[in-house]
Regions:
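Glycine-rich portal/gate segments that line the openings of hydrophobic small-molecule binding cavities
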Residues: 15, 45-57, 65-71, 78-169, ...
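Short acidic N-proximal helix/loop "leader" segments that mark the beginning
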Residues: 15-61
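Second-shell loop/turn segments in exported
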Residues: 189-194
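Short, flexible loop/turn segments with low-complexity composition
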Residues: 216-229
Length: 229
């Protein structure tokens, strides 16, 4: 009787596809109450970093209202990354099992073009800071060795909402050559946004909760509860 080789690339790709599908289907139940839905204007208008990938095969936009000022949200964003403050998401997936920080870490408050926010522990080239405007926007991306343009970009944009609230808008874009683990393009188009939604929901709510808690402790928020996520 023939035995199945679960170490073969075919099985690895199949397993990855199944996991992506499972995560994607889970996201359908989570997103309904996730409070990360971008409004029509946010989904269609141009954001910083869009020009880096002109014709993406995929683009997803999420947004959340945070009950603290943008100046209080920004420190949580600039310290992100595995081995840094974490991604405020599922730490066993993207932070080596180490719990994401629940305080501002002064050693990670400096950012510059080329700074690395490791996607996972040990990563050296993803994600790299491609653009930034203090307290306004951060654009991360991955430029593979030998490439001159990013294959994927991730923009985080902060917009002030009176009084004392912030709208965090995040957009991920992928250009055609990017096919993780050799997955076919059609599968990448369908599964990647769904799987991404699971992670980004946790991540965005993590930023919101941490920022709001810190602002509340300092009694610095003037944002009415009616505007929250």
């Amino acid at each position: 009787m023939a035995t199945l080789n679960f170490r073969s690339r075919t099985w690895q790709v199949a397993l990855l596809a199944f996991l992506c599908l499972l995560l994607g289907m889970t996201s359908l139940f989570l997103i309904a109450g996730a409070s990360i839905r971008a409004n029509p204007d946010e989904r269609t208008r141009k954001l910083n970093g869009d020009e880096l990938i002109v014709n993406p095969i995929g683009s997803v936009t999420h947004a959340i209202t945070i009950r603290s000022a943008s100046r209080d949200v920004w420190p949580w964003i600039v310290q992100m990354g595995a081995g840094r403050a974490g991604w405020y998401s599922y730490d066993f997936i993207d932070n080596g099992g180490h719990r994401s920080a629940d305080r501002i870490l002064p050693q990670f408050q400096t950012v510059g073009i080329g700074s690395v926010f490791p996607a996972v522990p040990g990563a050296k080239d993803a994600f790299v800071v491609l653009q930034y405007e203090p307290e306004r926007s951060l654009v991360l991306g991955w430029v593979p060795p030998g490439e001159h343009a990013p294959i994927t970009t991730w923009a985080l944009v902060l917009e002030d909402l009176p009084p004392g609230c912030t709208r965090l808008i995040e957009r991920g874009r992928v250009r055609s050559p990017y096919r993780p683990y050799g997955l076919p393009e059609w599968l990448t188009k369908r599964l990647a946004p769904l799987a991404h939604a699971v992670m980004v929901r946790k991540h965005m709510l993590g930023i919101a909760i941490r920022s709001e808690t810190a602002a509340r402790d300092r009694a610095t928020t003037g944002c009415p509860r009616s505007l929250t996520h």
